[in-house]
Every structure is written in structure tokens, then in C-alpha cells.
């Protein structure tokens, strides 16, 4: 009789132990799912604020094909790429960015902060040379490529504005100030935001 009671007690204890283990596992999975959901919701909010995906892409560490951006290492893409606070921008047309090492790309580099800009046409930078106005001017393009590599682009080519701390630049009214990138023809695009720069009238 005592052995039956002992077996019954052991069975009940085993069932209780199994039940508690399963409950703990369920709680852990629920907690993990809840954390994932919070992260996803946060990412959705940040995507809504800063962009994400192929068009207007970005997010915190984003990119995307068109109008990319984001906070850290953001941006890139083929058209109007770039932006982001650190290491932002690039892309084929209209780079940019705010913070260190911003901008770049083929048309209209730029950036705000140290080592901004570059690119083939309308690169950013202070005191370099803007992109060539015509593809036919081969020697000037080569000179500009060298100067882009040395200075990150430049100022005062068809009203292109010189940058401050390697920002802005370009030709045909491109860039300027802290941030804005050059742009190839027309008015330069819009790069990262920065402090207002006192314009140097000697460059105009």
C-alpha cells in the first residue's frame, strides 16, 4: 500500500515538474516573441520616420535604390542616394550625408563635416574644383578627378557654392554650406542638415 502511495506521489511530482518546465518554456517563447514584436514595431516607426525599402529606402542602417538614407552608414542607392548621420550617402546621382565621411557618388557629392564630398561632377569640398561642364573637356575632367581625390570637389563653378569643412560644392548652382551636395546641372540637391554657415562672399 505504501509503495502505491509512493508511486502515486512520484507520478504527481513528475507531472508537476513537466508542467512547470513547459510553462517556463512557454513564458520564455512569449517573452521572446514580445521582444521581437517591440523591435519590429520600433523598426516600423523608424522606417516611417527615416525610410526603408527600395523606394525612399533607408532605416537606421539602410540604403535602397531611390532616395536612400538612414542614421548610421545609411543611404546609397542609384538615384538621389545618401544622407544619414555617419558615413552617409553615395550613390550614382546626388550623394550627400551629414557627419564624418559624408557624400560621394558620380554626380554631386557633398556632405557635412570632415572629409565630405567627392564624386565626378559637382563634388563637395572647400577650395577644390567643380565638375566639368562638358564631357568634351577631357583634360579638365582629368584635373577635376585629381582635385576631387585631393580636396573632395570644390567651389565657384557656375555659381557652385564652396563648402565649409569639406561640404557642398558642385556646378550649375550646386550645393553650398554645411551639407548640400552639388548636383549635375540645374540646382544642386539637398544633403544633410547642419549649422548655418556664414557665406564667404569672396568666392562668389
Curated annotation (Swiss-Prot):
Annotated region Disordered: where? 169-204
Q: Where are the sequence repeats?
A: 54-59, 65-70, 71-76, 78-83, 85-90, 98-100, 101-103, 112-114, 115-117, 126-128, 129-131, 164-169, 171-176, 178-180, 181-183, 184-186, 187-189, 190-192
Q: Where is this region: 11 X 3 AA repeats of H-G-G?
A: 98-192
Q: Does the keyword NADP apply?
A: no
Give the Gly residues compositional bias ranges: 169-194
Q: What induces its synthesis?
A: By cold stress, abscisic acid (ABA) and water stress.
Region of interest: 7 X 6 AA repeats of Y-N-H-G-G-G: 54-176
Keyword tags: Repeat, Stress response
Family assignment from sequence similarity: Belongs to the GRP family.
Write out the function statement from the record.
Answer: May be involved in resistance of the plant to environmental stress.
- This one is known as Cold and drought-regulated protein CORA
This protein's species is Medicago sativa
Q: Report the gene name.
A: CORA
Amino acid at each position: 500500500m505504501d509503495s502505491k502511495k509512493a508511486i502515486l506521489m512520484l507520478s504527481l511530482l513528475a507531472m508537476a515538474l513537466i508542467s512547470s518546465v513547459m510553462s517556463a518554456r512557454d513564458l520564455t517563447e512569449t517573452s521572446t516573441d514580445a521582444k521581437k514584436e517591440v523591435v519590429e514595431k520600433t523598426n516600423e516607426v523608424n522606417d516611417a520616420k527615416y525610410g526603408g525599402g527600395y523606394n525612399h529606402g533607408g532605416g537606421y542602417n539602410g540604403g535602397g535604390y531611390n532616395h536612400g538614407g538612414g542614421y548610421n552608414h545609411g543611404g546609397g542607392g542609384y538615384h538621389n542616394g545618401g544622407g544619414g548621420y555617419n558615413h552617409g550617402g553615395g550613390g550614382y546621382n546626388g550623394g550627400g550625408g551629414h557627419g564624418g565621411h559624408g557624400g560621394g557618388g558620380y554626380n554631386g557629392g557633398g556632405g557635412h563635416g570632415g572629409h565630405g564630398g567627392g564624386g565626378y561632377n559637382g563634388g563637395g569640398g572647400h577650395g577644390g574644383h567643380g565638375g566639368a561642364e562638358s564631357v568634351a573637356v577631357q583634360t579638365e575632367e582629368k584635373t577635376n578627378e585629381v582635385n576631387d581625390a585631393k580636396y573632395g570637389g570644390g567651389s565657384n563653378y557656375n555659381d557652385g557654392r564652396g563648402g565649409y569643412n569639406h561640404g557642398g560644392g558642385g556646378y550649375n548652382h550646386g550645393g553650398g554650406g554645411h551639407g548640400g551636395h552639388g548636383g549635375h546641372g540645374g540646382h544642386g540637391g539637398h544633403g544633410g542638415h547642419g549649422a548655418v554657415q556664414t557665406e564667404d562672399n569672396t568666392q562668389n
